[in-house]
C-alpha cells in the first residue's frame, strides 16, 4: 500500500526520520509521496525522496503560503519539477477556512501551478477547504490539459466528492475518516467513491487516527499507520483489504506514472 501524502519535511520528524521511514516499510507500506508545501519544503522533499528508496515528492506552494508566490518561485518550481523524484505539482489549491494568504493570492498561485502542470504534462496534487465552488471554477478549464489530478485529504460533502469524480479527479482519504466526532459524513460516503478513483494517505505527522490503539504517546501520526487506515476504509466500504491495497496501488501507478 502506498501513502500518497506524507509531510516528511516536518520538524516533528527531524530527530528520527530514518526510523519513521523504516517503520513504514516494515509495516507493509511500499511507497511514499513526500509533500512539498512551499519552495523550501519542496526542495527538501525532493532531496528526501532521492535519499530514500521507493519515495517520490511533489513540488508546489500550499494555499497557506500563496503570498510567497512570485516569478522566481515559479521558475524554481519548474526547475525542481525536472528532477526524476518529483512526480506531481502541488500541494496547490484553495483554503478559505483560515485565509493565511488572501483569496486573491491563493487563486493566483493555484492557477499558476495548474499552468505549470499543464505545460510540463504532470498531475496536480491539490488541497481544497471551504472553497469548493471557486476551486472547481478555476480547475475545470485545465482538466483536459492535465494528465491527472488528486484532491488530497478529502473532507467535503457527498455532492463535492461526486462533482470531483465526475471530472475524473482522484480522491485522497486520510485517517480523518477514523474520527467518530467529525469523520462520520466522510465515512458514510466512502462506498460511493469508485475504487478506481480512490487513494489512501496518512497526511503524517497530522491526523493521527482517533481509533488507533494503543495511541503513541507523542500523538504524532506516521506513515506506518497507513495499514490501519486502509483496514478501516476497506471495512466501511465492505471490501477486502488486500484487494483495496492492490487497487489503490494501481491507481498510484496510473496517476503518477511510477513503478514500485
From Swiss-Prot:
Keywords: Cytoplasm, Exonuclease, Hydrolase, Magnesium, Manganese, Metal-binding, Nuclease. Disruption phenotype: Knockout cells are less resistant to the DNA damaging agent H(2)O(2). It holds the Pfam family TatD_DNase. No activity in the presence of Ca(2+) or Zn(2+). It comes from the Bacteria. It is an enzyme of class 3 (hydrolase). It is found in: Cytoplasm. Induction: Constitutively expressed. Its cofactor is Mg(2+); Mn(2+). GO terms for biological process: response to hydrogen peroxide. Changing residue 91 to A: Lack of nuclease activity. 3'-5' exonuclease that prefers single-stranded DNA and RNA. May play a role in the H(2)O(2)-induced DNA damage repair. Monomer. This is 3'-5' ssDNA/RNA exonuclease TatD. It comes from Escherichia coli (strain K12). The gene is tatD.
Amino acid at each position: 500500500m502506498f501513502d500518497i501524502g506524507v509531510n516528511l519535511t516536518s520538524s516533528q520528524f527531524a530527530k528520527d526520520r530514518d526510523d519513521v521511514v523504516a517503520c513504514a516499510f516494515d509495516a507493509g507500506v511500499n511507497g511514499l509521496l513526500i509533500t512539498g508545501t512551499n519552495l523550501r519544503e519542496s526542495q527538501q522533499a525532493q532531496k528526501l525522496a532521492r535519499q530514500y528508496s521507493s519515495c517520490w515528492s511533489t513540488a508546489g506552494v500550499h494555499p497557506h503560503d500563496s503570498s510567497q508566490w512570485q516569478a522566481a518561485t515559479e521558475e524554481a518550481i519548474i526547475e525542481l519539477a525536472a528532477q526524476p523524484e518529483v512526480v506531481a505539482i502541488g500541494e496547490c489549491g484553495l483554503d478559505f477556512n483560515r485565509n493565511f494568504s488572501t483569496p486573491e493570492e491563493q487563486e493566483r498561485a493555484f492557477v499558476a501551478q495548474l499552468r505549470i502542470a499543464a505545460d510540463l504534462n504532470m498531475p496536480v496534487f491539490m488541497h481544497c477547504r471551504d472553497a469548493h465552488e471557486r476551486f472547481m471554477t478555476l480547475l475545470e478549464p485545465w482538466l483536459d490539459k492535465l494528465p491527472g489530478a488528486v484532491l488530497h485529504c478529502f473532507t467535503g460533502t457527498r455532492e463535492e466528492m461526486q462533482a470531483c469524480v465526475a471530472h475524473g479527479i482522484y480522491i485522497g482519504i486520510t485517517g480523518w475518516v477514523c474520527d467518530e466526532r467529525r469523520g462520520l459524513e466522510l465515512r458514510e460516503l466512502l462506498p460511493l467513491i469508485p475504487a478506481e478513483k480512490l487513494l489512501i494517505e496518512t497526511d503524517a505527522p497530522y491526523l493521527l487516527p482517533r481509533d488507533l490503539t494503543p495511541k503513541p504517546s507523542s500523538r504524532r501520526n506516521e506513515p506506518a499507520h497507513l495499514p490501519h487506515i486502509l483496514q478501516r476504509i476497506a471495512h466501511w466500504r465492505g471490501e477486502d483489504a488486500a484487494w483495496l491495497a492492490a487497487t489503490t496501488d494501481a491507481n498510484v501507478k496510473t496517476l503518477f506514472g511510477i513503478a514500485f
